């Protein structure tokens, strides 16, 4: 559906204070001896051009989100960071489509890995299995798809940076106990998923990020095989 069906914006300017409060109350954080500091990793998704730009989440919503996570109530679609996400914005917001947040997980033996991604891309979205386009830039009447890559080729000499606000962000969750260098490699591997599903992707007008998060319940003897399994 076209982007204009979005009613509000909820996924920008999320203050980490509510999340920090939740962690501090439960003694979760980096141990500095005298206390545990709740470090919160934060990435912003730009969605001010969808719905009302004055509707913003606050610390109370961050705290409520943590409480909700205890009950495993996550949902794909127009929730959380996906509320104001959109795709196919090569010619502006009038011809883009509404997107959202999605997730997927697999288990191979005792290894578990999953990903959650808020898709807010400049390019179009494709089914990585068969190459079929599922969302993206539309014609002015919003009835048919337009190939964003064709628009890039036709407009590549334009110097002005008119493509802003494209921020696709995600997190990879695994129970493998990776080290920092291995996590860096894992984040790079995860970007292959973007390349399979978003066209164009990794342009100078887009921000694409993946944050790996290991839950570290597997023995380190499994790490080498885990890297191969995650590559699949």
Q: Where are the predicted features?
A:
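A structural signal for small-residue-enriched, beta-sheet-centric alpha/beta enzyme cores
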Residues: 1-14, 18-232
